[in-house]
């Protein structure tokens, strides 16, 4: 492993805030120099061995005091030059101006074993000029959620930032979890998150909003050179190709979310990755009973802007915001509009691909989308678990004597189950008729469905149980969840409990059904 060689291309190329202080302020440059604030008693709670291997960390190094000191913000490896990035964003549809890394500090870039440079960030490492008066810390509950979900999403095959380590600080912070006037102390923690780039849509929106076209252009050209080196050309042609690829990646990302039932919860433009990664895990969730209007974010319960079924439309809207920010670099809007159309075409193609895979078809035709939507309607009206519905369908055969037995574990309400049984049986008859003309062999169909329909997803109630145990010093569930989520598509003997539907006690419990942005 040693010596680690850190790169700092972002700060080497882009302009720096001349003021070196933690004073909250408007910053006109791309980044500010800032060091992590030390913590009193750092303790390693968990790490990802896969991410560590990519970054060339030896297994022995991960449990050394030096590693814990560095990734708690108490020390630096040689070559690290910590900084916070400046950006803005649209939040819940409104432009809010400068935001920036309010509690995230980038340590630098490290060349991975796969030949890719990765940025390493500490989330919860203390205040920065962008903290807006906050303490820059993160609570243990939100840190566990980000750590686990980063790794779970990766193993589901969904583009995402990763997590190297989760470290308790030994300190507490005051948070009002539900924003209801009841602040309380909570343990704090720090996550080291890892990605090739943490640049987001809001990185470009901020200078554009200020009319700083020079900085906007410099940011665009830096991002293309570093993060899109396969693109060639110059000027508007290059910029157009770049924007089109961002649209493509974003469409693929959201299609993956919809495939597994993931709800991001806070799709603000400052939470949209320029690489098409899932980024900034806050009040996310997986839909249990199939409700397209469900949002896990308690802040969003009135408008439901970021509800499950709206995610493709929100992604398109966010790309429109990015297009408007980039418009000063183009002579007309045609290239940007072409990129937005690329999003639509890519998403529709991905939706068809995923519907075919989830239903076990060789290809997806228009009538198959109707069949897919009809199943979603059935799931909603019968209050069926999305994950378990598709999992059961993967084991179904038309000659089964009791056609609904495959879904015995998927129903949340027996009354609704009985009421909708005729509709479900009718749907299965239509499905059987479609299978009879599909060219896929039975074994290939089952395997195709197995790879598209996860058995294990990071349900909020599972995460909440791990959080409550960890707050009492018991890390057993945290480590068990991390292990289970490494193989989400496989049957795991002895881990059946992690594949069960949400228990009734978790239906309306805070942390299990609804979450806030408090972290």
Swiss-Prot record:
Keywords: ATP-binding, Magnesium, Manganese, Metal-binding, Nucleotide-binding, Nucleotidyltransferase, Transferase
Entry cofactors: Mg(2+); Mn(2+)
Residues at the active site: 270 (proton acceptor)
One Pfam assignment: SelO
InterPro entries: SelO
E.C. designation(s): 2.7.7.-, 2.7.7.108
Residues that bind ATP: 100, 102-103, 123, 135-136, 193, 200, 280
One GO molecular-function entry: ATP binding
Catalytic activity annotation: L-seryl-[protein] + ATP = 3-O-(5'-adenylyl)-L-seryl-[protein] + diphosphate; L-threonyl-[protein] + ATP = 3-O-(5'-adenylyl)-L-threonyl-[protein] + diphosphate; L-tyrosyl-[protein] + ATP = O-(5'-adenylyl)-L-tyrosyl-[protein] + diphosphate; L-histidyl-[protein] + UTP = N(tele)-(5'-uridylyl)-L-histidyl-[protein] + diphosphate
Transcription regulation found in the keyword field: no
Residues holding Mg(2+): 271, 280
Protein task: Nucleotidyltransferase involved in the post-translational modification of proteins. It can catalyze the addition of adenosine monophosphate (AMP) or uridine monophosphate (UMP) to a protein, resulting in modifications known as AMPylation and UMPylation.
Family to which this protein belongs: Belongs to the SELO family.
PANTHER family assigned to the protein according to its UniProt record, in alphabetical order: PROTEIN ADENYLYLTRANSFERASE SELO, MITOCHONDRIAL (PTHR32057:SF14)
Alphabetized HAMAP family for the sequence: YdiU_SelO
Protein name: Protein nucleotidyltransferase YdiU
Gene: ydiU
